[in-house]
Amino acid sequence: MARVKRAVNAQKKRRTILKASKGYRGQRSRLYRKAKEQQLHSLTYAYRDRRARKGEFRKLWIARINAAARANDITYNRFIQGLKIAGVEVDRKNLAELAVSDAAAFTALVEVAKAALPEDVNAPAGEAA
């Protein structure tokens, strides 16, 4: 049987890892073993944070909607409740965009939400006074 030499494969593997770890500080960009370990961590963080990013954006949208809603004398909670009762199906991303870029349209939505809300704050959502 012929002898299998793996020098080329090993060099390619190391080169790939070191290329991917460019930009890391210190030994993590120069030494293969350190670079490999850092690369594993980096990929783990990237995977985790791609999922966390979705929650972060939702928090940002809610903060923007709340600020704009309070400027129109209604809380975020009551605003969303009013929109649901009125049957307005606009997601938080678009509501936040309206709040930032088109104040008049957002104010119109606030008026729709206020009109749909029951007069009595403690009344159930389905029963308008």
Curated annotation (Swiss-Prot):
Keyword rRNA-binding among record annotations: yes
One GO MF term: structural constituent of ribosome
Superkingdom of the source species: Bacteria
PROSITE patterns, sorted: RIBOSOMAL_L20 (PS00937)
One Pfam family per UniProt: Ribosomal_L20
UniProt keyword annotations, A-Z: Ribonucleoprotein, Ribosomal protein, RNA-binding, rRNA-binding
InterPro entries, A to Z: Ribosomal_bL20, RIBOSOMAL_L20_CS, Ribosomal_protein_bL20_C
Entry-linked CDD domains: Ribosomal_L20
One GO-annotated biological process of the protein: translation
A GO cellular component annotation in the UniProt record: ribonucleoprotein complex
PANTHER family found in the cross-reference section: 39S RIBOSOMAL PROTEIN L20
Function: Binds directly to 23S ribosomal RNA and is necessary for the in vitro assembly process of the 50S ribosomal subunit. It is not involved in the protein synthesizing functions of that subunit.
Family: Belongs to the bacterial ribosomal protein bL20 family.
NCBIfam families on file: rplT_bact
Name of the protein described by the UniProt record: Large ribosomal subunit protein bL20
Organism: Mycobacteroides abscessus (strain ATCC 19977 / DSM 44196 / CCUG 20993 / CIP 104536 / JCM 13569 / NCTC 13031 / TMC 1543 / L948) (Mycobacterium abscessus)
